[in-house]
Amino acid sequence: MIAKDFQEATATRIVDLFRKGHNRVLLADEVGLGKTIVAKTVVEKTGAWRKEINDPDYVVVYICSNAGIANQNCSKLGIAKENRVSISEGRLSMQHLMLAETESRTNVRLIPMTPATSFQIRSGAGTAHERALAYLIMEHSGICGSYSEELSFLMRTYFIEKPDSWQWYLEYQQWRIDQLSDKRGYLKRMKEELQNHMKPELISDVKAVCRKIRKHWDELPDNARLGSLLTWQEQKDLINQIRYCFAEISLGMLNPDLVIMDEFQRFKDLIEIDENDHSDGALLSKKFLMDNTESCVLLLSATPYKPYSTLTELTNGEETHLQGFMRVMDFLVNGKQENERFHMVWEAYSEHLSEIRGDNLSVLIASKDEAEHELYGHMCRTERRDSGIINTDKARAMSISNLSAANVSSYIELQTFMHKMGIGNFPIEYVKSAPFLMSFMNYKVKDKIDGAMAGKKYPIDPSYRNKAIKNMPMSFLRRADINEYKPLPDTNARLNTLFDEIFAKGEDRTGYPELLLWIPPANKYYKAGSRSIFEQCEGYSKTLVFSSWEMVPRVIATLTSYEAERLVNRRIGNKNIEQQTYYALPEEVDFDDGEDPKKNKRGKTRFLIREQRELVAYPSVWLAEKYEYKTYYGQELFKIRRDIKQLIKDDIDDVAAKTGIVRGSLGAKQLLSLLIYMDASLQGEERELPERLPSDEDLDTLVNMAIASPAVCLYRALDDVEDSVLRIELARTCCDQSFVSMFNRPESRSIMDAVFEGRRGFSEEKHYEQVFIYCADGNFQSMIDEYKFALGGAGEDFVEAINDSFLQTSNLPYVSQEFYRASFTDKPMKRAPRLRVHFAAGYFDAKTSDKTIQRVNNVRNAFNSPFRPFVLATTSVGQEGLDFHLYSRKVVHWNLPNNPIDVGRILRTFKIKKNVEVTDNGKIII
């Protein structure tokens, strides 16, 4: 994104401070004013400055609170993708290899880090990649002599049970080393660094453990558990000492030019280090930031310190807002003399404030000006002027559903059992937050109930246990009810309110959002008519739900998706076998082509068979040229179809006149052959003549293709791709991978059946006709153009973004009443039942791994697209929610956060688009 004038001015001011020797600056712009855009501009200007002083390398380190934000924001800092390090490889202890890899490739590098993965060495044993690389360097350096195999066993840990899996990590890291242009020089330097940084005591301890492993080698299991030889804590401590050693080495090599600390108040320990704290994290932070006078440091935070102190904080002797402010300033003003001067000026200002007199303010004003001048040398802040542009009076609050008896029943059920078993009280906040608690919660109170059911506290008779479980009908989901698509019992007012909102329920219901596969575009190119489900749902928005409870996103993701399926299912009169019951579908659906052209490998009947798939994914240039939205903007769809049909008919009549080919009904294969022939004719190429020319009904299909075929629309949207062959191929592959797969999903097929219920003439062989009509009704061209504009991407980048916008239908387990009852018998069920997730998604996995980082990115990309999911429930707050805004103008707080800073915010992009109107004379009004 291009910086606005005030953002450009702020960035210029920051770099000017850097040039003058103020190497630590705080950017404290108000929330929503684009601190990341300012940071991007600072990155660009600092890079230009480094070039001016002939600095050949430019290294930027980006530190934020978690891996999700790192992935979200690194792409916005203006450094090319190939010069950015993946957050999964952003471990401080691995940077020595990354720096060697990029040395020969580029002189610009962006390295993302998080406090948990880079500075808190003691929190775990590191990643497998991290341990594998450390082992290989130690082996190459000969640090542990002949104990190579034993050291490998030690570094593997029991997390990697299979030796083959560990071997893969070793081979991958060795491959990275082998690819270095100066492999020998790198290994030589690392040997020298290890000799300087690895203490003799550590080497001695490692060798001692290796000797033990060698002595008892035959007794050790294959899963790498050391058993009685070494406790896990001892093994972890030893590995972490090695990790710390490599982190120190990387730190010495890193020497970044610019360090950006985003929302640093979430990890203030990095800048507020106690001199008596000798932990590994404190020592690394001190070397990286406190003792580093060369790197420029940019702190980003709208709330760098608390604006006030509460009475409780003062009573308990906790840090006050003044202490927090002074700690931040002590970091920013890092010269001793400068720091003393700032404290003197601020104390004088505070003293004058306390002695304020109405008859003489000149001394106070002079003191205030001096204090402001001192602050201005170390921080920048821009605030939004409230001129009434944002009118919150028009904001509509959700009306909460009335409590039903079932809402209270679930609490009574659980509290009654806990009281009888003497295991305490059930938290009422849980009951308010989620329904079917025994099916979804994973908290200690659930463990208490499970223990009581198992007879761990008191012996329990099986018949009493079965009766107790039976007496909790409001606390469990029943698999049998789910399988029959029964309505969910009204057990939670919050969930019912959410359903009313997102499914537009009520007596005056006009739209059916459960039938949508994408959000209706804000600027539709034509009027599709009242029959269009997209017209009925005009103005529909995605919904972002924040909750402090981990179970809530799982509840919302599963039950909202189930409710969407149920609402669709009840609209289908003639159900196929797979639509009659919920669990008729396999829990894991594979959409790849199998030998049967109508079925995939698991026997699931696909909506689009192979010939239809090829037709839907074919970007016909001939058809693309027949429709241009500007020509028909704002007109009725039926009139546009009439005009386009005549244009196509004229071309077909010309072919008939020249070749004498007769008309007849065409299938998908024949239509595809016709389009290939017509496209070749445009280029003056010779192609085999089609067997027949299209009938009048087929002309209608071609008209819908010209207006809204996904492949044709993509071809038009890729008008910035100059290579015509590449443009066609990008449109074809993108459509095949993304949109054909979308229509082939079970929930999409049910939607097609529901939408076209009662309409005649749609045989299984012509499902492609339904796709084209559905896309025309949904203003597909307008939707895809809006998405491209919102992303700001072009060509291959846009295609990649589309492919990343689709979440595969997944499923999450729940504990059904049947499963729970069976778990206490001698015949427990092998696997808990699962619920499909597609209409809504959850964003709640707090563990950091390559897999969860990828999932976080997938969820974010999908929710920030016009496609499903339409509801996202997340435990993230504050900054993590800021980027979920392109198609969402609704924010729901399931539980209000304690800190106002954590109230969810969204950019008003979608709301603004909805309020833009174009008058008949072309004037744009808001």
Residue locations for each model-derived region?
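Helicase motor interdomain insertion/brace
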Residues: M1-Y887, P897-I926
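Short hydrophobic/aromatic-enriched beta-strand-loop microsegments
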Residues: V891-N895
